[in-house]
């Protein structure tokens, strides 16, 4: 079980309250697909992903990005039970979608970049440390079914 300090919880929940889930989620997923183009193979049903412009303008990328970041909200709400919170998603991504679990870490790193870009003043080194811990814990929980 992961131990969260009161300060970490405050930094995570405080920033999360300011996040526009639709915009940040869309940006995070689009960045993942652009920066790590091999991840596009998991999104073949999304249509045109042929260029950064196409990816950024793709409504399915935007919708799924919102869905992904909404699930991060579940982690924020359940900091003391992230493993169980993501048990079904781990099973889905492992057994049905066959997603490389390394992609969860990559998405977490991308999310950190998006948050830093959107919240320059609030995203202090202490805030980043708390969020790095969160994305690492979420990635581990999503990869759990693979072990």
Curated annotation (Swiss-Prot):
This is Hemoglobin subunit beta. CDD domains: Hb-beta-like. The keyword Transport applies. Heterotetramer of two alpha chains and two beta chains. One of its GO terms (molecular function) is peroxidase activity. Keywords: Heme, Iron, Metal-binding, Oxygen transport, Transport. It comes from Anas platyrhynchos (Mallard). Residues 3-147 form the Globin domain.
